[in-house]
Every structure is written in structure tokens, then in C-alpha cells.
Amino acid sequence: MMLGDTNNRFSASRAVVVLASGLLVGLFLVALLSQMLARIDALDALTQMRLATTLQNLIMFMLPAVAVGTLCGGGTPLRFLRLDKAPSAMAVAGIVLISLVMTPAMNWLVAWNASLSLPEAMKPVEQWMRAQENAAQEATDTLLSGSSVWDLIASVVCVGLLTGLGEEMFFRGALQRICCDGMRRRHLAVWTAAFVFSTLHFQFFGFVPRLVLGAFFGYAYLWSGSLWVPVIGHALNNSAVVAFMWMGNNSIDAAAMDEAGSQSAVVAIVSAAVTVAMMVAYKKILANGKKTH
């Protein structure tokens, strides 16, 4: 199956190779640059982590996505990634409202996934997975360890805005677009991109909620036709985590908001049901909006 316009045909398989190669090369470069940053005594651990995260978003995610967009989009990567289309007010309002409504269900899913354990025969695998989870959590704790207003702003920019943009460019703008054009099965493309998105975070005890979140962003992208919609949703989700961590660093109790619904299956079920209903309505509203333009 070919991608791109009639003047620039590019196979889906080659596009995946370019995207994956860019990710691997970017991973190597970021690891190398991170080691160099660690040797600079003038930089504290928090600053090093912010710089490393920024480099990761730019080199591992944004550049490969732009490369694929350039090759498949006839030299117009913004158009291929759907970054050239401003989202409608309804599309933005919808993803914000749905994100709020789905929070209890997502919190319950996070708690459930974190409580899972593997059979005794697979304990070594579970121990390795827990070690990966703990390492990721330690990195997150370091990245979000600041308590000043400047720390809050810097974390929102780095973790909220840059990560939201970078990951959506890679996983939805590039990977999901390639899968949609190559597979010709939109639902399969959404869930394939979401699966890769969750897997590459290497946080196995948060795999299911991140898979669901990735699919949510994928459908928002699919229905709206603008990558800015999932970028906004992703940035808001990450920024909420940043805000809760920052409040905790300042001894402000935000547990009631951060853990809403995590202990109640009934609340989670109601949240999930309302979320599904809102997404069905969201799809119809966006489809009708496209017909009127």
C-alpha cells in the first residue's frame, strides 16, 4: 500500500522503517547527550532531566515524524501530520470535557493495573518489570521534584507541552497515519498506534490505562482531522500530573482530585459509560461539522 500524494508515492512499510530507524537513532543520540549532560557539574539533577526530556522529544519523536511527513507528504510534513489544520472550538471543548469525565475510570484502571501480579513461575519477569516501573517512577519524581512557581512553569512546558506535541507527532501524526493509509482499517490503526505508544513507555504496570489513553487520543485525531486536538488532550493530561506533583511538593493535599474514582468500581463504571456516550456524540458532532464546511 502506498502513502502520500500522486506525485510522491511512498510505501507504508518503508515509512515504518524510516520512523523506527529515526526512533532508534534518536534513542542512541539522546543517551549519548544525556551522558554528556551528566558530566556537567554546573547542572543539577533536575536541570539535567529537563534537558534530557527536551532532547528526547525533539530527537526521538519530532524529527522522525517530520522526516516521515516530508517523505510521504511531498515535502509538506505539517500537512501530512495534520498540523496545518486548526481545530474547531467544539473539537477542543469536547476533548477537554471527555478527559475530565473519564478521569475516575482512568484512575480506577491505573490502580487495578498496578495491583496485578504474575504467576509464581514468572516472578523473575515480574521483578524485572517492577524494576523498570520503579526506575521510570524515580525519573518522573526527579523531573517533577521542584516546588517553586518557576519549577511548575518549566515542568508544564517540558512535560506537558513538549511531550504532548512530540509524542502525538510520532504516535498519532506519523505512526497512526501510516497504519491508516497502509492497513485501510481505521480502528486497527488507532489501536496499533496506541499499543506501540503504551509499550514504548516500558511501564508495564501502567500499560492498560496508557493503551486506553492512546486510543482516546487516536480517535480524537481520526474524527477531528487535526493533530492539535490530541496534542491539547495529551498536554492537559500531562500538565494535570505535573500540577498534582507540584502541589504535593508544596504540602498541598490534592489526593482527592488525583485519585478520584480509584477506590470505587461503581464510580468508575458510571464514568466509563458516560465517557463512551460522550465519545459517540463527539464523533457525530465533528462529522456534522465537517459536512457544513
Model-derived features: positions:
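Alpha-helical transmembrane segments in multi-pass membrane proteins
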Residues: L29-G74, A89-L100, E120-Q132
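Membrane-interface helix/loop boundary segments of multi-pass membrane proteins
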Residues: G166-T192, Y219-S226
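Functionally important transmembrane alpha-helices
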Residues: V196-F202, G206-A260
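Interfacial transmembrane-helix boundary/kink motif in multi-pass membrane proteins
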Residues: M2-V25, R50-L51, T76-R130, E259-S271, ...
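C-terminal membrane module of polytopic membrane proteins
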Residues: A31, A235-H293
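Transmembrane alpha-helical segments in integral membrane proteins
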Residues: F61-G74, D151-C179, V276-I285
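Hydrophobic alpha-helical transmembrane segments
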Residues: T53-M60, E133-L162, S262-A273
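Hydrophobic core of alpha-helical transmembrane segments in multi-pass integral membrane proteins
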Residues: A20-L33, F61-A67, V96-M102, V266-I285
